[in-house]
Amino acid sequence: MNTALAQQIANEGGVEAWMIAQQHKSLLRFLTCGSVDDGKSTLIGRLLHDTRQIYEDQLSSLHNDSKRHGTQGEKLDLALLVDGLQAEREQGITIDVAYRYFSTEKRKFIIADTPGHEQYTRNMATGASTCELAILLIDARKGVLDQTRRHSFISTLLGIKHLVVAINKMDLVDYSEETFTRIREDYLTFAGQLPGNLDIRFVPLSALEGDNVASQSESMPWYSGPTLLEVLETVEIQRVVDAQPMRFPVQYVNRPNLDFRGYAGTLASGRVEVGQRVKVLPSGVESNVARIVTFDGDREEAFAGEAITLVLTDEIDISRGDLLLAADEALPAVQSASVDVVWMAEQPLSPGQSYDIKIAGKKTRARVDGIHYQVDINNLTQREVENLPLNGIGLVDLTFDEPLVLDRYQQNPVTGGLIFIDRLSNVTVGAGMVHEPVSQATAAPSEFSAFELELNALVRRHFPHWGARDLLGDK
């Protein structure tokens, strides 16, 4: 057993007491991102090493792996703790998203180590989608690069409000305060272009040497701020969903016998209590909450993020994908929306194409009406394009086959986040964040049906010699 873990269990008074203490710790999900070879995997390895989360057999294996694949000479290559794929170890880069778990006396953590290469943008977006904080690594020798800007933009696009700019490899610039100050000013100048009210913090460190990672550095007396671990342990996460209105997407209708009918799911935002009047969308039927059933028994109220089963006073028609919200809230269903899209497939996203989409348990079909622009994620400029390529990010107009209840992604990631699914292969080909739902009054009517538009796109793609015109060419 890990000696540090054994000591923690002893201090808590046994395994059972230790497990109870773990359950009551807050959880922080964060990701590390930055340019290639900025030291992301090394930083995570250092956090695991310095918080004594590595077992003795892992440490022994790390010594052997460092001799075979290491890039740090005689020193331990801590990056190998995270780079698990054979291709990653041989190339010395991160390809896939690697998740690691550790805890301290104050908090539990889930780390997503995301790739820095531009061709793995889709992997980074996947890792960022569930995180609350992003650590942006910058090589002190190189300063703010295009990839730094790209990762910052993707993080904020996916709703991350807390950014920790870790200026790494300070040991290679002689722990220069001037270098730290210059990079800090450069990043703040760029950050003015990022959307939202962001919490940005700066920490100078050396992941290889351990300076300012888990303990204060003696080599940088000019820095009096917290270490990276102290920032992670003390940052107060802004949970946007707590302040938002109630949203309860139904994931499953639970009917184990004739006497019980409940609607299971995770409360996406707000709170719900017994006796509350609720409305079911898109039908608009109303009822009252009779019971809130959980694994630990009935509750009088529940809050955002909790998995619950709601029992209503009336027997009404509710199925998977329906949405429950407060009865006095007017939230219209829409059939069109502008959506920020991260495209993840080799086949580009083009106007006229149709895809299956899933959003908050609901599955339907959507047609691409047009592409407003693609974002150049290296300098955040916008340019007109005919299609959205692999790893491209852009603003797209969608029309759905049926009315949907949507929120803006920045307000509610559950009811504002969707995925695109290829209808033939059933593969996820893109991720979308609702930029703005379009009400029926403002949606432009189409003179063509969804079938006609899809057939037109099919003919133009496979039979270009027929010379068929683009029915959406005016968009």
From Swiss-Prot:
Reported function: With CysD forms the ATP sulfurylase (ATPS) that catalyzes the adenylation of sulfate producing adenosine 5'-phosphosulfate (APS) and diphosphate, the first enzymatic step in sulfur assimilation pathway. APS synthesis involves the formation of a high-energy phosphoric-sulfuric acid anhydride bond driven by GTP hydrolysis by CysN coupled to ATP hydrolysis by CysD.
Domain of life: Bacteria
GO MF annotations in UniProt: ATP binding; GTP binding; GTPase activity; sulfate adenylyltransferase (ATP) activity
Region (G5): 206-208
Binding site for GTP: 34-41, 113-117, 168-171
Name assigned to this protein: Sulfate adenylyltransferase subunit 1
Stretches for region G1: 34-41
Biological process (GO), any one: hydrogen sulfide biosynthetic process
Quaternary structure annotation from Swiss-Prot or TrEMBL: Heterodimer composed of CysD, the smaller subunit, and CysN.
Record-linked InterPro entries: CysN_GTP-bd, CysN_II, CysN_NoDQ_III, G_TR_CS, GTP-eEF1A_C, P-loop_NTPase, Small_GTP-bd, SO4_adenylTrfase_lsu
Domain tr-type G intervals: 25-239
Entry similarity comment: Belongs to the TRAFAC class translation factor GTPase superfamily. Classic translation factor GTPase family. CysN/NodQ subfamily.
CDD domains, per database record: CysN_ATPS (cd04166), CysN_NodQ_II (cd03695), CysN_NoDQ_III (cd04095)
SUPFAM superfamilies membership: EF-Tu/eEF-1alpha/eIF2-gamma C-terminal domain, P-loop containing nucleoside triphosphate hydrolases, Translation proteins
Region entry G4, spans: 168-171
EC number(s) given by UniProt: 2.7.7.4
Region of interest (G3), ranges: 113-116
Stored Pfam families: GTP-eEF1A_C, GTP_EFTU
Keywords: ATP-binding, GTP-binding, Nucleotide-binding, Nucleotidyltransferase, Transferase
G2, as annotated region: 92-96
Substrates-to-products reaction catalysed: sulfate + ATP + H(+) = adenosine 5'-phosphosulfate + diphosphate
Pathway linked to the protein: Sulfur metabolism; hydrogen sulfide biosynthesis; sulfite from sulfate: step 1/3
Protein encoded by which gene: cysN
